């Protein structure tokens, strides 16, 4: 028998992107294992973790990928984005430069990923309110202008981490399930599904046999 963790209705690949040090790895570990590591070092290469959630009675298995934000690891981008249906674009609310770089990350994402990818802008480290360098309203306005959803999180104290992943996975599920319904409707209406078979009764007359419309 298979592992229960292997039983799912949908598998969605979601990537974490953003500058190094914004807390991508801790967002991943908080959501998938409910862990936080203050000594977390920069991720080298690529790693991913999985967790399943329920949406509308369906089991959604999220495969969440994390990679280092440093420029020297950019060689992995094409493989990293391949097959991704969602992305969390993360910045640190206490470091304005990480927010300034969001635009560059967004461009890279749109250059490499599927055009229909669902993107959420995430302002992480909301627990550092006293050090805030990026106003919430400014980030929200940027997200709205670029068609992104937006949330502020804290991997340290768990604030909104669950909500961020649940929101993006639910949005992906809605899009995928609506597309499946639309495809089914189109399939039901296609000519091949509307063929009415015509039965010609056999005749006893000795007429030459003709094959007509055999391939229709």
From Swiss-Prot:
Pfam families recorded: Ras (PF00071)
Keywords: Acetylation, Cell cycle, Cell membrane, Cytoplasmic vesicle, Endosome, Golgi apparatus, GTP-binding, Hydrolase, Lipoprotein, Magnesium, Membrane, Metal-binding, Methylation, Nucleotide-binding, Prenylation, Protein transport, Transport
Localization per Swiss-Prot or TrEMBL: Cell membrane; Endosome membrane; Recycling endosome membrane; Cleavage furrow
GO cellular component, one term: phagocytic vesicle
Positions occupied by motif Switch 1: 36-47
An example molecular function term from Gene Ontology annotations: G protein activity
Keyword Signal annotated: no
Ranges spanned by the short sequence motif Switch 2, renumbered to the chain: 67-86
Membrane topology annotation: Lipid-anchor
Matches recorded under InterPro entries: P-loop_NTPase (IPR027417), Rab_GTPases_membrane_traffic (IPR050209), Small_GTP-bd (IPR005225), Small_GTPase (IPR001806)
Positions with a binding annotation for GTP: 20-26, 37-38, 40, 42-43, 69, 124-125, 127, 155-156
EC number: 3.6.5.2
PROSITE patterns per record: RAB (PS51419)
N-acetylglycine sites (modified residues): 2
Residues covalently joined to lipid (S-geranylgeranyl cysteine): 212-213
Family, per entry: Belongs to the small GTPase superfamily. Rab family.
NCBIfam families in the record: small_GTP
Protein name, per record: Ras-related protein Rab-11A
């Amino acid at each position: 028998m298979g592992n229960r963790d292997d039983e799912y209705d949908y598998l969605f690949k979601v990537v974490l992107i953003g500058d190094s040090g914004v807390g991508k790895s801790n967002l991943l570990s908080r959501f998938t294992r409910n862990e936080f590591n203050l000594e977390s070092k920069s991720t080298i290469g690529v790693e991913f973790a999985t967790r399943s959630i329920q949406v509308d009675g369906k089991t959604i298995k999220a495969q969440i990928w994390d990679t280092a934000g440093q420029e020297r690891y950019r060689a992995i981008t094409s493989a990293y984005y391949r097959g991704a249906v969602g992305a969390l674009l993360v910045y640190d609310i206490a470091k304005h430069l990480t927010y300034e770089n969001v635009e560059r990350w967004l461009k890279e994402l749109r250059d490499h990923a599927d055009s229909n990818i669902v993107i959420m802008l995430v302002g992480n480290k909301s627990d550092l309110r006293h050090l805030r360098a990026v106003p919430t309203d400014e980030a929200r306005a940027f997200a709205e202008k670029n068609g992104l959803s937006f949330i502020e999180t804290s991997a340290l104290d768990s604030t909104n981490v669950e909500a961020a992943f649940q929101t993006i996975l639910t949005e992906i599920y809605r899009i995928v399930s609506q597309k499946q319904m639309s495809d089914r409707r189109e399939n039901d209406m296609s000519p091949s599904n509307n063929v009415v078979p015509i039965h010609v009764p056999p005749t006893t007359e000795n007429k030459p046999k003709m094959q007509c419309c055999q391939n229709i």
